[in-house]
Amino acid sequence: MADFLPSRSVLSVCFPGCVLTNGEAEQQRKSKEIDKCLSREKTYVKRLVKILLLGAGESGKSTFLKQMRIIHGQDFDQRAREEFRPTIYSNVIKGMRVLVDAREKLHIPWGDNKNQVHGDKLMAFDTRAPMAAQGMVETRVFLQYLPAIRALWDDSGIQNAYDRRREFQLGESVKYFLDNLDKLGVPDYIPSQQDILLARRPTKGIHEYDFEIKNVPFKMVDVGGQRSERKRWFECFDSVTSILFLVSSSEFDQVLMEDRLTNRLTESLNIFETIVNNRVFSNVSIILFLNKTDLLEEKVQVVSIKDYFLEFEGDPHCLRDVQKFLVECFRGKRRDQQQRPLYHHFTTAINTENIRLVFRDVKDTILHDNLKQLMLQ
């Protein structure tokens, strides 16, 4: 029967458009495969939930991103933990240098004058050395400074300077690490999950983290919050589903590190006003995270917000009154009060369980709003 089948050459004469050479067939197969990939990519992009983390420097964005990694299945393995060790050592040395400098400028006497030698040693630390300039300190170097750091932290003069920390710039995790010097001083010290969450590494550039929840792809983008980094924000605005705007709610009595003049809460309010009234985000859900609730709760007991925001009318030592005032401040920055609702949450970014519960609610809000937008397209 094969003798009666027309040859390939006959077919090509009779039906020139129906016969493909091996090369043409392969090209067509590749073309179809590319079309399938593009179709899948288009579907993925349409389903992708892109969340932008915005806020002033040290508001907790990077800590929140670390929590997403912990909560959604990519915990820090031993190698990743070890990579944070030089950063933590740098945090400790930098923090102690700030305290030694503050003690002198605030004219606080030493508890023990012999500690002047230790203070001088810390102030002579070479911050321009290659690793130190990148915010890292080797174990060998840290252990050389450890006895001096321990003696200084035990000095009443340094403790008094710490008690007046709102008068100068000091990292919020410094006390945690100084209280754990014995653990940090072990030569084979491996940072714990909590150590990593509290380690401070200023965000330079753009950091992304991808994860899935029930087959829905999420992309979380963290951009540096310092003034010098904010010009990069516009690079991330494309195809944004939601913005999580983080505020350090406890910093109502502190000023910016960049200019030493601007109130930190005022700076956050100004940034938020720019974001919430930007037409680019008219269809984007904006969720306000009033972060560092644990520190705010401590602060309202001893510092009156009314001394810094005269319009405050509640009880300055009542956490709920202060939180209500903060929410009203941010809501008041929206020029169009009829626009999409402004969701808010009170958070403590270093508390994994708190962030797990809050993000569960946030995820539902984002997915609900995103579904409505897709239905309108």
UniProtKB/Swiss-Prot annotation:
Its main location: membrane. GO terms for cellular component: brush border membrane; cytoplasm; heterotrimeric G-protein complex; melanosome; nucleus; postsynapse. Residues 218-227 are annotated as: G3 motif. Residues 347-352 are annotated as: G5 motif. Pfam families: G-alpha. Residues 47-377 form the G-alpha domain. Keywords: Cytoplasm, GTP-binding, Lipoprotein, Magnesium, Membrane, Metal-binding, Nucleotide-binding, Nucleus, Palmitate, Phosphoprotein, Transducer. InterPro entries: Gprotein_alpha_12/13 (IPR000469), Gprotein_alpha_su (IPR001019), GproteinA_insert (IPR011025), P-loop_NTPase (IPR027417). Residues 50-63 are annotated as: G1 motif. One of its GO terms (biological process) is cell differentiation. GO terms for molecular function: D5 dopamine receptor binding; G protein activity; G-protein beta/gamma-subunit complex binding; GTP binding; GTPase activity; metal ion binding. Residues 195-203 are annotated as: G2 motif. It is a lipid-anchor. A lipid is attached at C14, C18 (S-palmitoyl cysteine). It is found in: Membrane; Melanosome; Cytoplasm; Nucleus. Mg(2+) binds at S62, T203. The modification Phosphothreonine is found at T203. Signal peptide: none annotated. Residues 287-294 are annotated as: G4 motif. G proteins are composed of 3 units; alpha, beta and gamma. The alpha chain contains the guanine nucleotide binding site. Interacts with UBXD5. Interacts with HAX1. Interacts (in GTP-bound form) with PPP5C (via TPR repeats); activates PPP5C phosphatase activity and translocates PPP5C to the cell membrane. Interacts with RGS22. Interacts with ARHGEF1. Interacts (in GTP-bound form) with ARHGEF11 (via RGS domain). Interacts (in GTP-bound form) with ARHGEF12 (via RGS domain). Interacts (in GTP-bound form) with CTNND1. Interacts with GAS2L2. Interacts with GPR35. Interacts with GPR174. Guanine nucleotide-binding proteins (G proteins) are involved as modulators or transducers in various transmembrane signaling systems. Activates effector molecule RhoA by binding and activating RhoGEFs (ARHGEF1/p115RhoGEF, ARHGEF11/PDZ-RhoGEF and ARHGEF12/LARG). GNA13-dependent Rho signaling subsequently regulates transcription factor AP-1 (activating protein-1). Promotes tumor cell invasion and metastasis by activating RhoA/ROCK signaling pathway. Inhibits CDH1-mediated cell adhesion in process independent from Rho activation. Belongs to the G-alpha family. G(12) subfamily. This is Guanine nucleotide-binding protein subunit alpha-13. It comes from Rattus norvegicus. The gene is Gna13.
